[in-house]
Amino acid sequence: MGKRKANHTISGMNAASAQGQGTGYNEEFANEPLTPAERQNNKKRKKNQ
């Protein structure tokens, strides 16, 4: 079988829009300071990566 284009991509849009979060809408908030609760959670996640 030939390669098929991914079903979840929307033709005509930027290719990156189909590849996970952090593209487009969410990008504006990328450099907002974290709340103390988020910072704590971030530390825990870092260890597991």
UniProtKB/Swiss-Prot annotation:
Residues 1-49 are annotated as: Disordered. One of its GO terms (biological process) is asexual sporulation. Residues 8-20 have a biased composition (Polar residues). It is found in: Spore core. Its main location: other. This is Small, acid-soluble spore protein O. The keyword ATP-binding does not apply. One of its GO terms (cellular component) is endospore-forming forespore. Belongs to the SspO family. Keywords: Sporulation. InterPro entries: SASP_SspO. It comes from Bacillus cereus (strain B4264). Pfam families: SspO.
